[in-house]
């Protein structure tokens, strides 16, 4: 699974996922299913926000290429992927500026068009079950919830799907591609079933023997985001970097 993650996700996403796991004391080399899940969630959050801007009249528009007008601003502020301290700083700043209530839990995005925080979910189970779990945890009508599945289903608060159909279809296509690529490598069943994942982990550790824990070869590409997070969220060039990996995975 670790090899799959490094082959199929943009290096910037992989680096952010590793950083997130290490912040919580988790090892991407051991908890590989969680590693894959975090990368998937990060990519969906980026895809959700990409190409969406607000013009000088406050209208939401889509810009897919070129250098947009300087008056345009990103419609979504990405909170997911930041370290906790910085993420809460961003949330507090948004609350102070807009007057919205501070959420109890860190959300994934802030929608400047609808003036609300958004929680993005990606589930391997039924969307309505995961939606209810999210809603029961958040317990706030202020935070909008949008759930995607690997089977093309989705569910959102009050059936408000926020994005246009094409943008949502792009996300669903990417999730379906990830599922197909996992299945072709025999990884999907263990990704879906925790019990199967534990069995696979024991098998992997046994096969690795005394080499377990040694560093593996990683991409030498270093994301500027790790040097300074802010430009990544505001720089339009991140779109091109991520876009290349959306609809394809390199085969072994």
Swiss-Prot record:
Keywords: Decay of host mRNAs by virus, Eukaryotic host gene expression shutoff by virus, Host cytoplasm, Host gene expression shutoff by virus, Host mRNA suppression by virus, Host nucleus, Host-virus interaction. The active site is at residues 80, 108. The record marks 195, 198-199 as: Important for efficient shutoff activity and nuclear localization. Pfam families: Flu_PA. It is found in: Host cytoplasm; Host nucleus. GO terms for molecular function: RNA binding. One of its GO terms (biological process) is viral RNA genome replication. The record marks 202-203, 206 as: Important for efficient shutoff activity. Belongs to the influenza viruses PA-X family. Plays a major role in the shutoff of the host protein expression by cleaving mRNAs probably via an endonuclease activity. This host shutoff allows the virus to escape from the host antiviral response. Hijacks host RNA splicing machinery to selectively target host RNAs containing introns for destruction. This may explain the preferential degradation of RNAs that have undergone co- or post-transcriptional processing. The probable endonuclease active site in the N-terminus and the basic amino acid cluster in the C-terminus are important for the shutoff activity. The C-terminus acts as a nuclear localization signal. The C-terminus is recruited to host protein complexes involved in nuclear Pol II RNA processing. This is Protein PA-X. It comes from Influenza A virus (strain A/Hong Kong/156/1997 H5N1 genotype Gs/Gd). The gene is PA.
């Amino acid at each position: 699974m670790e090899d799959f993650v490094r082959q199929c996700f943009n290096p910037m996403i992989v680096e952010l996922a590793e950083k997130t796991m290490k912040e919580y004391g988790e090892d991407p080399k051991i908890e590989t299913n969680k590693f894959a899940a975090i990368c998937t969630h990060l990519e969906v959050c980026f895809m959700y926000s990409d190409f969406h801007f607000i013009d000088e009249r406050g209208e939401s528009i889509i810009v897919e290429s070129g250098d947009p007008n300087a008056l345009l601003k990103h419609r979504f502020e990405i909170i997911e992927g930041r370290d906790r301290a910085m993420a809460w700083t961003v949330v507090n700043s948004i609350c102070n500026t807009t007057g919205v209530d501070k959420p109890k839990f860190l959300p994934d995005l802030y929608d400047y068009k609808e003036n609300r925080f958004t929680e993005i979910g990606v589930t391997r189970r039924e969307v309505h079950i995961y939606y209810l779990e999210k809603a029961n945890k958040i317990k706030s009508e202020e935070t909008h919830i949008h759930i995607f599945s690997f089977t093309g289903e989705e569910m959102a608060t009050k059936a408000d799907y926020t994005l246009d159909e094409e943008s949502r279809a792009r996300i669903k296509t990417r999730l379906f591609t990830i599922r197909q690529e996992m299945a072709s490598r025999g990884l999907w069943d263990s990704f879906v079933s925790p019990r199967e994942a534990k069995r696979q982990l024991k098998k992997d550790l046994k096969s690795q023997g005394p080499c377990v824990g040694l560093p593996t070869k990683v991409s030498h590409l270093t994301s500027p985001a790790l040097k300074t997070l802010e430009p990544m969220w505001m720089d339009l060039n991140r779109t091109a970097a991520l876009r290349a990996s959306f609809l394809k995975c390199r085969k072994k």
